[in-house]
Amino acid sequence: MSILSENNPTPTSITDPNKSSHLHNPELNSGTRVASGPGPGPEAESTPLAPPTEVMNTTSANTSSLSLGSPMHEKIKQFDQDEVDTGETNDRTIESGSGDIDDSQQSHNNNNNNNNNNNESNPESSEGDDEKTQGMPPRMPGTFNVKGLHQGDDSDNEKQYTELTKSINKRTSKDSYSPGTLESPGTLNALETNNVSPAVIEEEQHTSSLEDLSLSLQHQNENARLSAPRSAPPQVPTSKTSSFHDMSSVISSSTSVHKIPSNPTSTRGSHLSSYKSTLDPGKPAQAAAPPPPEIDIDNLLTKSELDSETDTLSSATNSPNLLRNDTLQGIPTRDDENIDDSPRQLSQNTSATSRNTSGTSTSTVVKNSRSGTSKSTSTSTAHNQTAAITPIIPSHNKFHQQVINTNATNSLSSLEPLGVGINSNSSPKSGKKRKSGSKVRGVFSSMFGKNKSTSSSSSSNSGSNSHSQEVNIKISTPFNAKHLAHVGIDDNGSYTGLPIEWERLLSASGITKKEQQQHPQAVMDIVAFYQDTSENPDDAAFKKFHFDNNKSSSSGWSNENTPPATPGGSNSGSGSGGGGAPSSPHRTPPSSIIEKNNVEQKVITPSQSMPTKTESKQSENQHPHEDNATQYTPRTPTSHVQEGQFIPSRPAPKPPSTPLSSMSVSHKTPSSQSLPRSDSQSDIRSSTPKSHQDVSPSKIKIRSISSKSLKSMRSRKSGDKFTHIAPAPPPPSLPSIPKSKSHSASLSSQLRPATNGSTTAPIPASAAFGGENNALPKQRINEFKAHRAPPPPPSAPPAPPVPPAPPANLLSEQTSEIPQQRTAPSQALADVTAPTNIYEIQQTKYQEAQQKLREKKARELEEIQRLREKNERQNRQQETGQNNADTASGGSNIAPPVPVPNKKPPSGSGGGRDAKQAALIAQKKREEKKRKNLQIIAKLKTICNPGDPNELYVDLVKIGQGASGGVFLAHDVRDKSNIVAIKQMNLEQQPKKELIINEILVMKGSSHPNIVNFIDSYLLKGDLWVIMEYMEGGSLTDIVTHSVMTEGQIGVVCRETLKGLKFLHSKGVIHRDIKSDNILLNMDGNIKITDFGFCAQINEINSKRITMVGTPYWMAPEIVSRKEYGPKVDVWSLGIMIIEMLEGEPPYLNETPLRALYLIATNGTPKLKDPESLSYDIRKFLAWCLQVDFNKRADADELLHDNFITECDDVSSLSPLVKIARLKKMSESD
């Protein structure tokens, strides 16, 4: 008779007739209870086993002459059944036998549950049986002694049956089994169904009850061999259906368990020829370790998804789970051992075991001494592959360690997802298998540790995923970063790293060094604030970016600080190339500073207004050494700003520079000149661009230079490679082209490089200045290819923005004219230092050619602009393609661009990438701005009246002029007596169109007696007409400057203003620009607030604002300090306006705006010139308005109840002042 185990589908032979006879005892029936352990424990002996009664019926299908059928026949029959049940499973199982992955995947889930169940057994009760079983004789596979089949009959007493049961348990416990053959989930469920440790399985009238019973017995015996017997309370037999499902799940659930046939002739055994079984974990010989801290198994099992299959089956049979009792608490655990995916023999390598300590948690386990582990290592051996040979009994502490390991694994895997199973370093194999396990461990870690889907257990998944996240996380490089310099303060209170433009600003604004040291943080805040408000913050950031790149020499904008090498000559080139704020938007694909420079030469981009277009051309072209110092010395955008007037509002003076320093750089090869730090930063800073002027085109052309190329170029400053690079005269700037064209031109130049990929400067242009050396460009191209950095070619950038290289005819003409310029670096130096006659001739011819070229390109630029306007809403790629096509078609009649620019930018230069990224961001911002403008115009069309205001309002009389339009008076056609004020604005010239929409919307929704009434708005031919109520009395500024106001009159103005502010604040609107200019009066003295362009909307989400707007002298400290602010900023401005009415001007009006901001931020509440002459009420009111801490500052409603307001005069008291102001104003105008 064969006993089929779920872990070993091959029948196991029984040689002892005494031990096999009880299987055929007809008394064995559904009530059979199997001894719980391999040895006869005291409790096992006292437990009677009811003999089965229908054994013969279950084997009636057997045709063997034996009473219970032939063992071989049973084996064949069982194999056939297994083939159906475990068809695909066997393949995976066989793979796992050789250390494959399946073992670590599916069996991990099943075996964790089984291990917990196995560990519940009492290790002490198995010691005695271990002694008995060690001397069992060996048996041969497939042999049977059939005499035992006839010794017992149906009337055998129960004692004999019990002895047979125990002997069969002992015998089967010695059978070899594959690693990881702990109970499968199916067997565990069967055991849980009966709620006993040894699992009583009852079969009632089932056709295959004997086979199922044999299968169950084998599993129980194997389980008992690993776990000590435990007293089991009597069990209520389960129903036939549940028992059948439990038993049938034994085979179906064993998907990844190792299976070793006991019959070597079996066909399945051939598949397992490569498998090496592990040792039978013996019985524990040492005393049990102290129990670990209590573990709430229920919580662990609830959290873990590993028990999903077991729990489902267990819940179906309404049986309690054995894992949920407290028996596991008495089993010692080790925190440095665990089961690797599927249960295997304990690792024999102590060091490998200890390595796993870091991968497991010690929170729920108790550490044991390692003496037992090291002891067992020396005595453990491996089983033979066949089960026929009796295995050598391993040392006793081996089993103890395995129990510990199993328990630790179950606890840890469910408690902390540290990847115990998958990433385990401890492979419980013995002998040589341990070595292969270490290899497989790495495979598991690499294959499953990073893949969530491959692991079947959630705990191991989470552990491996946490590990993989750490490994796989890739932090991208920063983008959109604008912080390029850090300004610090040393111990002496002086600034470190302060940008030069900031130093100039501070010195020009009258902020002394002492004041800077007293309030260093305030100075930095107000300077940053001033820059943000006086210029485009994005442009300022890009300027710093540009400057910083020069400083580090890592960026492609190498020539930003070099004298404007732009052919347009003049500092504008340097400004444009060098990072003037406005130029940044035009530096799109940094890939072509060259083309960009061509564009900039021809077109002065709005941001790059050339310093003095004519002066700069000649001063830099003819006498480069005179003005270059200023450009080069600062090395910061400030210098460019100053000279190029990029930021006209900035009063900073030019920094002094040493023109002779340029001579030091002049002898350098163009490459070194183009590099910001070619030899030393000091040289470049101090050097005037005289040499740069000569080589200016080459400098500007340089895109980005890698560190390698920098070194190589430095080492070969005087090498022959650069002998022919002669200084090219910068082309004159082109004032004739309007700004709008310059923008499109720069875009076209940028777009072209994108397609051409011309990152290395267009070398062919160099031929323009070296007639005899037309082949030189190729030579230099090859040379620079090796360095992967673009050479600084002296190509003529003045050409139109579209073609990177000047026309061929121009090149040949220039070549013939100035061949000697490229002879050698020494010659280049001589040309720079020698009289300017040759240089002037070159410049003249160059300018003439450039002028012709510009005239031809003017029409093309206009066409490009129109095309760009049509394609504004398309994505950047489409727009680029369109512009490139237009550019190519436009430039084809002149000269095709040289193919050299098609080189890709050097990937090795990090600075080039940064520069390219900055240029792309700039281009993107421009596109976004255009889209935003279109959206604003579309919004205005929906807000404004589509009619023609000229049909409704006549007799327009201009009474004022603003930055973006004029103010007119007109009569309403519908009521001639009604005079209205019309604010006419050119949207193209309006810097912040969104403010207009804001103003219209606020005025439309703000109908209040103290707010100027909004009548209507019109959008006519690009001009916005805003029709408002006309306040003929003028502004409060006229009264303040032409008369002296009493406290009562001041109180009236404050009261009416506070009423309007209270209304605005109640609607969530902050005016942010309260001052006398925005308080209008009529002839009767009525007061109304106007100019809502800067007003801000406050909502629940954004209860405070941090933008910086308004007029500096009236600004609250929290705005100047760039802190969050709320409606109380209008109260501060009202307090400043009171001082204005008292003293005729706001505080610090005579100071520069920057110093005024500094004083506001540092002085706090401004001091009155003559406070003694004022009453207590006005001083108290004023102090309440001018609290530096806005939390202590009053709001509009509180101020309206102040005595100063309640006791003020009537509005009619202002009428005389209005009339006086009008008379004085009229007399002044006459």
Curated annotation (Swiss-Prot):
Main location: cytoplasm
Domain CRIB: 475-488
Signal peptide as annotated in the record: none
PROSITE patterns registered for this protein in UniProt: CRIB, PROTEIN_KINASE_ATP, PROTEIN_KINASE_DOM, PROTEIN_KINASE_ST
SMART domains hit by this protein: PBD, S_TKc
Ranges for domain Protein kinase: 953-1205
GO cellular component assignments: cytoplasm; nucleus
Catalysed reactions, as listed in the record: L-seryl-[protein] + ATP = O-phospho-L-seryl-[protein] + ADP + H(+); L-threonyl-[protein] + ATP = O-phospho-L-threonyl-[protein] + ADP + H(+)
Spans annotated as Disordered: 1-384, 413-470, 545-831, 867-919
Record key words, sorted: ATP-binding, Cytoplasm, Kinase, Nucleotide-binding, Nucleus, Serine/threonine-protein kinase, Transferase
Protein's recorded name: Serine/threonine-protein kinase CST20
Provenance organism: Candida albicans (Yeast)
Taxonomic lineage from the root: Eukaryota, Fungi, Dikarya, Ascomycota, Saccharomycotina
